[in-house]
Amino acid sequence: MPDESKNLGKIGFDNNGEPKIREPIFVKLSSYRNAKFIDIRKYYEDNEEWKPTKKGVTLNKEQLDELLKILNDNVNDINKWLSEE
């Protein structure tokens, strides 16, 4: 199987597809040497092409499961923290 990538979504764009922040975040499924990952990474625009930065994280299934559990177990605390002024 060749290395491949599938874009799941982007964070930091308006409804017209224009970036609202300097380095938007892309969420992608990717594979490398028959291993599958989810990649959450900041991107920058270079000559009208989005390119990845080193700022991000690549997770395998076990790591993603652990992250999702942490987020789900703490969703109330996270929402409260982010809502406080």
Task: Report residues per predicted region.
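Intrinsic disorder/low-complexity signal
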Residues: 2-3, 13, 38, 76, ...
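Mixed-charge, Lys/Arg-enriched low-complexity segments
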Residues: 61-85
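A short, structured beta-strand/loop element
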Residues: 24-55
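Negatively charged, low-complexity tracts enriched in Asp/Glu with abundant Ser/Thr
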Residues: 1-20
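Active-site scaffold segments
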Residues: 56-60
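Generic low-complexity, intrinsically disordered sequence content enriched
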Residues: 12, 33, 71-75
